[in-house]
């Protein structure tokens, strides 16, 4: 006679099967998560290693560029011709070469051929004071470089930038802006370290930024040698007070703006033509141009003190391309007439366009 099966035993077997299935599902889910996390860690590690490879290659290229600038300066000393221009310098051309599994490209720019925003103030009586002549230059440059729809901002931006730099907290004129106009931050009231602070001005709003970005948006024709678009930021820099403007590398827009207070913009075209074949070796030749014949002695002395034919400040832009990606290093270098050549700024920036043109744009 068969023993009758207890009803609860079937339920226990069913519950055990469900528990086994749940354990199996949980183990499978945990395994998938472990594999996923391991893959993510491996991918992240590989990306970091690739990034580090590109960065180390860029640093190596930076070291090579520094040595090239030192060699160039020593050659100039031997030749007794301390001149930096865009036609004869070894550093003036773009460079590109393969190295192991990468391609390294680089260009060098003369920062003293750009408009020094810090020149808007002078240090006098233990404080930084506005320089009306420099502000007029800055306004003239902005008027020519800003998008046509925003050219009216030139005067406002020039005065706001001067207020950003000067020591006092007084708004100078209806177009200025001091601490009270800025929330969550205060004006530095001293020279800036980078021209990007220009973006912090009250009137440099999102609309203006978008207009500038649209104006210099990269095109398919853009290359290292031919950017194919106007680069707004290529015309500005932030260097120590008293740094001279190198007339042998300054683009036409900067030269015209610099001479605007003297109504001598015509000198810019003459300088551009002359330096193509015979770079200027001293500033006396510049002041001898007909456009400056009507300058008063004090104006002549002041202008001569602001101009130069060589440079001590350079920018090196380095792109390192590998199968894994592209990195860009921007290094700024000081090469003084006495003392060691040194890096005073180094930053990794997004690669949003072609390399900046070698030397400076015309």
Predicted regions and their residues:
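Compositionally biased linear targeting/interaction segments
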Residues: 2-9, 15-362
